[in-house]
């Protein structure tokens, strides 16, 4: 199997692609070519993963009228020429996009050249690039039930798959008792994990800092992942803390300790929600208000509606409100966990590869 993969800009587009690639490699001999940009995170992440990487020069379309969009149009045409050569040289069986503006010229060119094509949409609300590409590709893989209508007349091309990142988390061998022991947490105390993303989230951090005096009066444990940039300031603010409240700037193997937790406080990015539902974790979601079309709040809605999560908008976030939400979630943990697990799609990577193989066989 020869496959070209494109997706980039943020980890939310890259890590699902890598999860899919690893599942393909596990199941069948394959050759992979990844097409991204040098400015996106994919240039480093994909190369570090040992996957052949080629870059094109492309930028995103601005939603307002701008001369930059004219320049983007020229870059798009230039990229089409380069992608055409890369595809002719590599001769893939299928071309897959996982989101980000880099997918635009790659999947568009592949479809026009007659290659089988699929795009994977991680969010409930699709981005501009994937909505554009839906007109040309053979299949659109969805991560959230009910999001197909956003593709309009191309809804018939959609298939519910889930986020491949979930499959990697599902396959981890995790001993919750051992994970708590590593951090020095007592087994019989409910553990809350706060994670605002790799850079941290200042609004979440402030609310947690404000909540900690009340938290010390409970029997809860807290793992507070602040983000590298904020760690020293928060450490100075809080001073000496009891052992059951721990600060970390960042955690590389976060899913391991998540499995040992009873509640997670986080943003509602697509990969985060895939991890939470695969592990069946209750959550308090605080969507980022800084993302396109408020898609994180749309992502969170399916978890909130089924009782798997509580939602607090950042504009309404305070330490007291967060503490009250924690109290409710800890009390309702069993029901929220059951609802969360019911939304999980742990076989997403395998199901996605099955769909790729079906598309390839149809060609033949």
UniProtKB/Swiss-Prot annotation:
<keyword id="KW-1003">Cell membrane</keyword>
<dbReference type="GO" id="GO:0005975">
    <property type="term" value="P:carbohydrate metabolic process"/>
</dbReference>
<dbReference type="GO" id="GO:0051991">
    <property type="term" value="F:UDP-N-acetyl-D-glucosamine:N-acetylmuramoyl-L-alanyl-D-glutamyl-meso-2,6-diaminopimelyl-D-alanyl-D-alanine-diphosphoundecaprenol 4-beta-N-acetylglucosaminlytransferase activity"/>
</dbReference>
<dbReference type="GO" id="GO:0005886">
    <property type="term" value="C:plasma membrane"/>
</dbReference>
<feature type="binding site">
    <location>
        <position position="123"/>
    </location>
    <ligand>
        <name>UDP-N-acetyl-alpha-D-glucosamine</name>
    </ligand>
</feature>
<protein>
    <recommendedName>
        <fullName>UDP-N-acetylglucosamine--N-acetylmuramyl-(pentapeptide) pyrophosphoryl-undecaprenol N-acetylglucosamine transferase</fullName>
        <ecNumber>2.4.1.227</ecNumber>
    </recommendedName>
</protein>
<feature type="binding site">
    <location>
        <position position="198"/>
    </location>
    <ligand>
        <name>UDP-N-acetyl-alpha-D-glucosamine</name>
    </ligand>
</feature>
<keyword id="KW-0961">Cell wall biogenesis/degradation</keyword>
<keyword id="KW-0132">Cell division</keyword>
<dbReference type="GO" id="GO:0009252">
    <property type="term" value="P:peptidoglycan biosynthetic process"/>
</dbReference>
<dbReference type="InterPro" id="IPR007235">
    <property type="entry name" value="Glyco_trans_28_C"/>
</dbReference>
<feature type="binding site">
    <location>
        <position position="251"/>
    </location>
    <ligand>
        <name>UDP-N-acetyl-alpha-D-glucosamine</name>
    </ligand>
</feature>
<dbReference type="GO" id="GO:0071555">
    <property type="term" value="P:cell wall organization"/>
</dbReference>
<dbReference type="GO" id="GO:0050511">
    <property type="term" value="F:undecaprenyldiphospho-muramoylpentapeptide beta-N-acetylglucosaminyltransferase activity"/>
</dbReference>
<feature type="binding site">
    <location>
        <position position="296"/>
    </location>
    <ligand>
        <name>UDP-N-acetyl-alpha-D-glucosamine</name>
    </ligand>
</feature>
<comment type="function">
    <text>Cell wall formation. Catalyzes the transfer of a GlcNAc subunit on undecaprenyl-pyrophosphoryl-MurNAc-pentapeptide (lipid intermediate I) to form undecaprenyl-pyrophosphoryl-MurNAc-(pentapeptide)GlcNAc (lipid intermediate II).</text>
</comment>
<keyword id="KW-0808">Transferase</keyword>
<comment type="similarity">
    <text>Belongs to the glycosyltransferase 28 family. MurG subfamily.</text>
</comment>
<dbReference type="Pfam" id="PF04101">
    <property type="entry name" value="Glyco_tran_28_C"/>
</dbReference>
<keyword id="KW-0133">Cell shape</keyword>
<feature type="binding site">
    <location>
        <begin position="10"/>
        <end position="12"/>
    </location>
    <ligand>
        <name>UDP-N-acetyl-alpha-D-glucosamine</name>
    </ligand>
</feature>
<keyword id="KW-0131">Cell cycle</keyword>
<keyword id="KW-0573">Peptidoglycan synthesis</keyword>
<dbReference type="Pfam" id="PF03033">
    <property type="entry name" value="Glyco_transf_28"/>
</dbReference>
<comment type="pathway">
    <text>Cell wall biogenesis; peptidoglycan biosynthesis.</text>
</comment>
<keyword id="KW-0472">Membrane</keyword>
<dbReference type="GO" id="GO:0030259">
    <property type="term" value="P:lipid glycosylation"/>
</dbReference>
<dbReference type="InterPro" id="IPR006009">
    <property type="entry name" value="GlcNAc_MurG"/>
</dbReference>
<dbReference type="InterPro" id="IPR004276">
    <property type="entry name" value="GlycoTrans_28_N"/>
</dbReference>
<dbReference type="GO" id="GO:0051301">
    <property type="term" value="P:cell division"/>
</dbReference>
<keyword id="KW-0328">Glycosyltransferase</keyword>
<dbReference type="GO" id="GO:0008360">
    <property type="term" value="P:regulation of cell shape"/>
</dbReference>
């Amino acid at each position: 199997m020869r496959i070209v993969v494109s997706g980039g800009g943020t980890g939310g587009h890259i890590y699902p692609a890598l999860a899919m690639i690893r599942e393909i490699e596990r199941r069948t001999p394959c050759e992979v070519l990844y097409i991204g940009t040098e400015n996106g995170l994919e240039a480093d992440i994909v190369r570090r993963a040992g996957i052949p990487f080629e870059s094109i020069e492309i930028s995103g379309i601005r939603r307002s009228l701008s001369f930059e969009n004219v320049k983007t149009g020229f870059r798009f045409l230039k990229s089409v020429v380069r992608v055409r050569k890369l595809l002719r040289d590599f001769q893939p069986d299928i071309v897959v996009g996982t989101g980000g503006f880099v997918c635009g010229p790659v999947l568009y060119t592949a479809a026009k050249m007659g290659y089988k094509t699929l795009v994977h949409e991680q969010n409930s609300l699709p981005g501009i690039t994937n909505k554009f590409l839906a007109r040309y590709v053979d299949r659109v893989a969805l991560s959230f039930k009910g999001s197909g209508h956003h593709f309009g007349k191309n809804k018939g091309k959609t298939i519910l798959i889930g986020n491949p990142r979930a499959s990697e988390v599902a396959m981890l061998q995790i001993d919750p008792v051992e994970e708590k022991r590593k951090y020095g947490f007592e087994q019989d105390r409910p553990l809350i994990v706060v994670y605002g993303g790799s850079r941290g989230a200042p609004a979440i951090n402030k609310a947690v800092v404000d909540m900690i005096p009340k938290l010390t009066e409970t029997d809860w444990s807290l793992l507070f992942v602040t983000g590298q940039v904020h760690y020293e300031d928060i450490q100075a603010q809080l001073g000496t803390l009891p052992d059951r409240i721990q600060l970390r700037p960042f955690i590389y193997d976060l899913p391991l300790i998540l499995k040992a937790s009873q509640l997670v406080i986080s943003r509602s990015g697509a990969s985060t929600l895939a991890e939470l539902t695969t592990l069946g974790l209750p959550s308090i979601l605080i969507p980022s208000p800084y993302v396109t079309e408020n898609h994180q709040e749309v992502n969170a809605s399916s978890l909130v509606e089924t009782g798997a999560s509580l939602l607090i908008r950042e504009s309404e976030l305070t330490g007291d409100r967060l503490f009250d939400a924690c109290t409710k979630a800890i009390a309702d943990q069993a029901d929220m966990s059951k609802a969360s697990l019911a939304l999980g799609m742990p076989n997403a990577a395998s199901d996605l590869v099955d769909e790729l193989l079906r598309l390839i066989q149809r060609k033949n």
